[in-house]
Amino acid sequence: YQTSTFMFETVEQGGARFAGTETGYVYSRPANPSTNAVEDKIASLENGEAAMATASGMGAITAMLYCSVVAGDEIVADETLYGCTFAFLSKEITQLGVKVSFINMNNIDALKAALTDKTKVVYFETPCNPTMKVIDIRAVADAVHAFNKDIKVIVDNTFCSPYLQRPLDLGADVVVHSATKYINGHGDVIAGFVVGKPE
């Protein structure tokens, strides 16, 4: 559906949709049948309950992190990250009073030492961009959830894609993607996805 708006059968139907008392499409920014179809496919590929499409991979990453933390919270992230993600975590989100610690996520002792009662998110990519370092998702998720099951383990699965790796099946809580890379495969689309578990 290459449209920004949708028709209604009646004025009353339009009013009900805008009021939120009837489900259906109103405007393509919040929902579009084509976007919903892609979201459903990505969620299925990742064994997730639902997915949200974004305008870019960084849109997916920042949306997920912004809704997961507030001032005073802490994020523990791997030290090897895509440059824009590292810049966001080290320079942008910290301006909102969020503390970010960077560690080698393969060092489980360092991970355990970095976790505090203020930690809300553990974030990493695997394989990492650009070094292709591989991180043991299950080992990280098990260590984090043993400390506090409410901490979100967020994995950027851009470089593996769900064809080779499904982080939710390995204990992660949320998966993010830059669809520009392997999901699209051609470098001619800019998009991102956030995929979550049933809970």
Each language-model region and where it sits:
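Short conserved active-site loop signatures built around small residues
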Residues: Y1, A37, V194
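Residue-level marker of positions within ordered structural domains that often coincide
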Residues: M7, N47, K197
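C-terminal substrate-binding/catalytic lobe of Rossmann-fold NAD(P)-dependent oxidoreductases
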Residues: Y1-T5, E12
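Conserved N-terminal alpha-helix of the aminotransferase class I/II PLP-enzyme fold
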Residues: T10-G59, C84-E92
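A broad "ordered helical/assembly scaffold" signature
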Residues: E9-T10, T126
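Conserved PLP-enzyme active-site core in the AAT-like
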Residues: A51-E199
